[in-house]
Design a protein with these regions (language model features):
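Short beta->alpha junction loops
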Residues: 1-7
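Active-site-proximal C-terminal subdomain of hydrolase catalytic domains
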Residues: 72-174
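Caspase-like (clan CD) cysteine peptidase catalytic core
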Residues: 7-31, 35-92, 158-167
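Residue-level detector of conserved, well-ordered beta-strand and adjacent loop positions
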Residues: 2, 44, 124
């Protein structure tokens, strides 16, 4: 959904829950405004007003419910938005994964095993604070540029891409 309204985003999530099977791999990318009010995190769609309480913001708790309904074997959500990353339910702490874990001879076996398990991962540009906007001359945020750089690196690797590895490699780049 490009420049999605609240209705468009809800429809896209509903469609994903109907169309996906346990054999699917799904990537969701949200780039837009986010806000925290009353300790709740929100996505602000293109038709969202600046005023909280107008009913046109999307609570992250609602997104979590939509994600639960998507039947995909692996689901990754990349969020390039202020304030919302820490509010996703069951979010992993990436700091516990070190680069040495990735370079070990056991990493391939770890990935093989991980691919057999159903997964839900969220990688966000911000947790509870403001994140940077577009990098001059690129048309992309620092987060998006970091993702694109990592995709180029992983394209040349012999092992599959996983969100946890990507997060470790991106840490500190945006």
């Amino acid at each position: 959904v490009n420049n999605g309204t609240k209705k468009d985003i809800y429809k896209a999530f509903t469609d994903l829950s109907k169309l996906t099977t346990t054999n699917d791999y799904v990537l969701i990318y949200y780039s837009g405004h986010g806000q925290i009010k009353a300790e709740q995190a929100y996505w602000i769609p293109t038709d969202g007003s600046e005023n909280w309480g107008s009913g046109d913001w999307i609570n992250i708790a609602e997104i979590d419910i939509f994600l639960t309904d998507i039947k995909a074997h692996h689901l990754a959500v990349l969020v390039d938005s202020c304030f919302v990353g820490s509010k996703f339910k069951g979010m992993n702490i990436i700091d516990s994964i070190s680069m040495s874990d990735q370079s070990s001879e056991h990493y391939g076996k770890y990935l093989e095993s991980a691919l057999t398990l159903r997964s839900r991962s969220v990688l966000a540009s911000g947790t509870t604070g403001q994140v940077s906007d577009t990098v001059k001359g690129t048309g992309h945020s620092k987060f998006a540029l970091s993702i694109l750089n990592q995709l180029n690196v992983f394209d040349k690797q012999s092992y599959p891409l996983d969100i946890q590895s990507m997060a470790v490699l991106m840490k500190g780049n945006f």
